[in-house]
Amino acid sequence: MRVLLICVGRLKAGAERELVTRYLDRAKAGGRALGLSGFDTIELSESAARRPEDRMAEEGQAILGALPQGADVIALDPRGKNLTSEAFAERVRTGRDGGRPAAAFLIGGADGLSEAVRARCDLMLAFGAATFPHQIVRAMLAEQVYRATTILAGHPYHRA
């Protein structure tokens, strides 16, 4: 199963980009033996529309256009469900074992996700009730993806 992060906005060179790259490279190395591949990031341009609803609609169309057919679509959203790291790993396992061709993790723009994207999601996921900058959320997501591969592999990285 291909693992993909689809994000509105681009990470500039710096500590956050390096951290995301490091976690995804680690996930890629460990994921091969688990039947997981890719661990790629697609960065979509932020909309320049004036109204928030127009920005969400434009960004939503770009997100939907980037989704692989048949993917398990999991979006980060503050109103989403909180999962333990073990439950997150189990979600990845279930998608893989269920024959899903891809797991697509979505991070929307500053205004959030359009209703069209929300309707396409199989799961809305939250990393708690706090608000985080998008670049930090991307690093947190990359770490959880890596942690999921270590949990599935029985690696000692995860010691909960």
Swiss-Prot record:
SUPFAM superfamilies, per database record: alpha/beta knot
Binding site for S-adenosyl-L-methionine: 76, 108
Coiled coil: none
Annotated GO CC locations: cytoplasm
Entries under Pfam families matching the protein: SPOUT_MTase
Molecular function GO labels: rRNA (pseudouridine-N3-)-methyltransferase activity
Annotated InterPro entries: Alpha/beta_knot_MTases, RlmH-like, tRNA_m1G_MTases_N
Keywords in alphabetical order: Cytoplasm, Methyltransferase, rRNA processing, S-adenosyl-L-methionine, Transferase
Subcellular location(s) of the protein: Cytoplasm
E.C. no: 2.1.1.177
Top EC class of this enzyme: transferase
Reactions that this protein is recorded to catalyse: pseudouridine(1915) in 23S rRNA + S-adenosyl-L-methionine = N(3)-methylpseudouridine(1915) in 23S rRNA + S-adenosyl-L-homocysteine + H(+)
Keyword Repeat attached: no
Lineage top rank: taxon: Bacteria
Biological function: Specifically methylates the pseudouridine at position 1915 (m3Psi1915) in 23S rRNA.
Family designation: Belongs to the RNA methyltransferase RlmH family.
Quaternary structure note: Homodimer.
Name of the molecule in the record: Ribosomal RNA large subunit methyltransferase H
Organism: Azorhizobium caulinodans (strain ATCC 43989 / DSM 5975 / JCM 20966 / LMG 6465 / NBRC 14845 / NCIMB 13405 / ORS 571)
Encoding gene (name): rlmH
